[in-house]
């Protein structure tokens, strides 16, 4: 016996006899009487038609029919009927109507037992087709569609491949086997069924002995006659029945509205009198229509003869009963078995929107126009955002010149000690009307307005008649204006001019004469905010595929195929085309295929295999009469294919609506007049159902065996509790592969405890297929599960409603799993993402999050002085820590408990908020109260509150309000971090977005930088949509002028990118030709436009200088692009354009270095850093500023051979070549010392690695700088298993040679050490700033910065917990370690070898000889008649070496000239001649190895003879060699030759040699006292003197006198062979009180350590400690004396 279980599934009872149930049945007599009356009426109508055409059913036909495999079995039999008849004796022509109906009701007519039984039995044709639900896994001939129209949502169905225990599945469990039992089977209902509204008696048993036969597509003529005979009843009724008011008004659509009386007591019954089963498909859904919103009378349908009789015989006053697809659900309880109770899914109103009906009442396919409009409906959140931006826009009217100047303002940086040395500068100002510029000297502290007044004095006699405010100073060569209210020296342009020692050129203009084409206009102010209007030119890496136009095309194609399928004779082929159209729609929707779509497609395939009904054109002599006299109330029998098509269309439109809502992030729950419940009162647990992942690639199917999800809930970047793992499942295949879980996930947290910013994370993992051999990774056998992708979803929407309904979440592959809370996932190309279907509960009310009420009148502030001393000390220690990183749990608890004691220390607020125990609603009132009484933070301190650790909207809004105090120029420096901080905003319309857009409205430089940063961020997988919206808002409010300029820049970047790609792909020999041809296209762009440089918008280019364009010989083959400045007063513009490398990391490193430089400048330390610009213009491409007059260290060193990196002089000699005078060289050396110190500190703090001589550059002015920051934060480049960067930073001996001015240490090296330590300590004070800046960049996707762990290097490098003195000692040791590292030189050497393939002669614009800046020819200088090495001289520079005097006599000259060359310069000449003339026989060069010292007189004398012989042989060689430009350049006189410097040095110039017993020099000490300890730091000693003039090995020894036992002896390490040692060592004396120390003296002695004799005294000093103020540090130089020492 079959019955309905409590979970609405059928169960087979063990007993064959059911227990009696107290229900009431219509007895047999009543039922037969009703049937007889109906048949009598039909017989009467039949007499009006022609006599039936008879035919015989042959035995062969019967056998063929019996031969079919029948997969369906009847569940119901009627024992009161006669026994089954054999078809062999039937004469169809003689059959009466009643006999035909009997055949129809005979379950065993012309059937026989099939060879194989189906998985699940199905109902017989006589069973009610209206209330029959097929199991999801069953196959049969009846179509899976509803008979007749309906207006409800289809219940949840599941693909047959993934059987699911649904609410009701045809009365049987899917796991129930088939049973060909002859015993009676009963259908019964549980007694406690809540939906059963009438009693039933025990049901009449059914005998499942037969089933409806499966029909072939083609039937024999004999069978066709029988079918025609049986169907004639329905045909007559169908074609002859007059239309009545009982017919529904809309019969054309696939789904129509049916009104069901809510008062009906009988909900679900099976009607057994289905008299025309062949004209209707069997229904696979049992659904109840419930429309509470519509109150009008229901419409009843009659779809078979028995229904027509029942409807016609009813009294007009009879109560209209509930109908399901035209079947009565109440009235007389006519039963053959107990009816089934079935509840359907909830209905959606949208079904009616896709139904239409023409005036004739015929059926038509839905157009879906109302649904398509949903794709154009703007997201509610986006609409609210547009309104907010429009309101913001009104605050910046175009008439306000302060916020809308139309030109760029020169950025300013405040410098300390600006009025020191060289405070006056020379200014040259171009004035209209004057032929020559006005030149005068002014103070750098003077305001720009004063400079303007000085310039106006040259053209106006009376300034009282002049409006000084209408004049501006424009930078020559740039569209950039100085700010009148700032001092001249604070502008970055002026600072760069002073740095490069170039002339300051300005132009005096009136405001009206200044180009203001970037200003907004009245039309711009009136234009509405449209986020998509100006994005059409933006290259979107992830294309939108769900727009109305493509969806409309797909739907049109689908409906066209449906119409063809319904009209064509060959429906099999047409249905295949329909299914293909459905597949295309699902493919366009990212491969999402809902269960209803899957089931509808299967039912359509089954329906097309059914025999088609007799068409309407059946010939009949009295057909028209028949139609006129048809019985009222009867309807067309439904076409099975039509019904299946209707349900398929419904499923497709449901899918489209779901996808549209998900794409627009719309809620699935209608708001309307629903009740609202506050979240803090909701005690329900958070739960949802993970249904499936759609669009799985075939690679995953072959590589992974199982899949599972990790579900986590986070807030403030941390999990609220342990993540939950789903079950492990495999993949399935319908249209596409999918992973199906259908699993309920319940989090152990109540909704009331959820913070507003709670984020759900779903991470997909794959378990590798151990048997898969197709994977290229052989190690997969040993690997664990792999993370395949991640997606995040905020639980409360922007209106603060809890999410509900079905969501499609876009999950990205493992290379993009850096998901951040609050992301609106960005859609990609079809099948490039995985779509995760998640179903949230849809309660009857909305849950909304409301903020707690804050009592602002309560002010609590505890005084820190009232705390106990130990608690106070601990609290101050935590407060004064530089960062909240590394706070322990105990520290956080302690800090939170004492938070009100910290109000006088505002900058500790981030630490306190990070220590909050939780952010539950119940605790927010206290937290917000603390926030609102907290003193304002400075902008840089408030920046930390924008990190992921602080997701609370109140906190972030307050932080942004404090940010308002930051200047535009400071904001421009931090803009990349602000752009990344947008990812931590939960909603689009945030205070941070409005803040950035407001600053962009008031400053063109910020708008320009923000544009390129947002454009580059469009490539972000998770946040591309958000950045697209912000970028659209920026372009919408920025004005037409700015948009047109940005469009031109983007076009220029695209053109240069194409050129760079072509050059990279070209072969080496054709690259230059390809470059020149490709640049012609770029040149054509400039013929139509002038264009601002994306790198620096103040630079405007008007054309290319194609002849100067080239490419660099490196892996990426970057372009050197030379452009002509549009300003005739400006210089050429040179930039590098690179394709194939990610420049975002370079941008970050350069930004950090620039911020460091500004910190140093504000503190008065100018390290003369070279800050060049870098901009990423797209994925793996960008533009870099070229620093003029600079070369790499490799180029400089290889001029001295491949081993040049092991030599000490190349850098010094290269600088001397470009700075020939002593004054110039001294200035260049000073620039080198300062810039080298800054580079050492910056590269160490940032952990910049992969440092070799090809990414360190030197300018001719002496400024050193680094390029190429592909490795940083300590991620070193590996050489095998060894780190290539073994030293803390690059400081080589050739650098030290320039710093010292020679081989021996001097006081200049002490200056270098002091500069390094001072710069290091200044950066250490800003540890929190740099950690915050880097932390905000974690979600940017940089390969070297992926997690908070990467910041550990920076924190350790900055040593935040040490004192300045300890940090000074620490960094001094780093300098010593770097200087003594042979690994750096070896790394340089290896790189020289690797770059040999790029070696050769320099290009025309490079010097041919290292010591000569230009190339000369004999045409200019005249031919040489005689040349010889005249003599040699000893020279000090500062080391001793010999220089050779070459005597030259030229044609046409009577007097010889002399040039001075070193032996190394002769050798360079020979080496380069060998390169130029590899096939010529050159004279041999005297380069034999010299043992011992080389710079001695004997060696010089021998070399003089050898070099003279070499020159004679060279001049007697071929004229091609002897008269080449290289030889001419070698003999061309230099500035040093003309001044005859360095030939002989006077005796007084010889290094000082002290007389016996002479003492000299000074020592620099730092003396401080704290915590009962005296600290003596020995820093430097300078100008030591020895008896014999040899370099000593100094060290320092100290005592605290009196000390008879010498227990206070302390000493430093020994510094070898130097008169100017640097120690920076701390000598500590512990356990001394201040009173005791005032009675002591510090005795310091400097001695030289000797190995073969006794150490000798170099000087000393005795310092009474009572003269020191021990409460502060004292740093001072002390002169050494000849005092006695212990």
Swiss-Prot record:
Any one of the GO CC terms: cytoplasm
Domain PX as annotated: residue spans: 1420-1536
PROSITE patterns (alphabetical): C2, C2_PI3K, PI3_4_KINASE_1, PI3_4_KINASE_2, PI3_4_KINASE_3, PI3K_RBD, PIK_HELICAL, PX
Gene from which this protein is expressed: Pik3c2a
Phenotypic consequence of gene deletion: Chronic renal failure and kidney lesions. Affects podocyte morphology and function.
Cofactor note: Ca(2+) or Mg(2+). Mn(2+) cannot be used.
Residues modified to Phosphoserine: 60, 261, 328, 339, 630, 1281, 1553
Free-text tissue specificity from the UniProt record: Expressed in brain (at protein level). Detected in podocytes.
Protein known as: Phosphatidylinositol 4-phosphate 3-kinase C2 domain-containing subunit alpha
Cofactor(s) annotated in UniProt: Ca(2+); Mg(2+)
Organism taxonomic ancestry: Eukaryota, Metazoa, Chordata, Craniata, Vertebrata
